[in-house]
């Protein structure tokens, strides 16, 4: 019986070690995920602050309304505006009219699918 007890004890110790390693790995993954979320939040805050500096109130309002329906398009426009501002190609704040022109340009770049029925 002592051999059987010894095998059981070794097996139990092995299982406990595996479980402890798995828990440590899960904690590390959770911590990494939290760090990524924090970095994403900081990026969004910085982007929001830059957009507030670049756009007029009316243009920001238009962009916020558009974000509800087309978030990918708004993200693309925000990135383009930030890059233009960092490159120094923007003079002053972007007005609502200038934003409309930019929206038309980007919307015109999309492929248009036309279906005709016969």
Curated annotation (Swiss-Prot):
Residue stretches of biased makeup (Low complexity): 18-39
Region described as Disordered: spans on this chain: 16-39
GO molecular function: DNA binding
SUPFAM superfamilies given in the database record: Double-stranded DNA-binding domain
Keyword vocabulary terms for this entry: DNA-binding
Pfam families: dsDNA_bind
GO CC, one annotated term: cytosol
Keyword Iron tagged: no
Protein family (similarity comment): Belongs to the PDCD5 family.
Matching NCBIfam families: PRK04239.1
Protein name as it appears in the record: DNA-binding protein Msm_0708
